[in-house]
């Protein structure tokens, strides 16, 4: 449907530790992160996250250091596996994808800039912005047009 979100997260939990699925019910029953750490030596990363992201919108994930921003983003492309929850991208259940299907979704439906990213110093800003498209095999005209479009969108046109 036209109103369906581009990305939908439902009931997302991430508990770091070897028995994450076993202790999940304690968190769902109200156990806080301090008690979870003290009693089970597990760390609560995400707790019952529910988000819809529409196509064309800019979504900001903001919070203090250690609040779970990077953990949340890494769940979208399954760089981190959730303890529980649902991830839909264009209506596709990302949790049910094979490695090859997941690789295809990562290449065609999303991208990510890591916190400790490394720009290639011998390339221009536009060439760095176009790098993923080059790796994907897009022609040079498409690479340049897309890079210019997105650089303009974030106020970096002309670099």
Segment roles from a protein language model:
Residues 36-41, 95-111, 135, 140:
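ABC ATPase NBD coupling module
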Residues 25-35, 90-93, 130, 134-137, ...:
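Conserved ABC ATPase "signature" region
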Residues 123-131:
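Short coil-to-helix segment of the ABC ATPase nucleotide-binding domain corresponding to the Q-loop/switch region
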Residues 77:
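Helix-to-loop junction immediately C-terminal to a conserved catalytic motif
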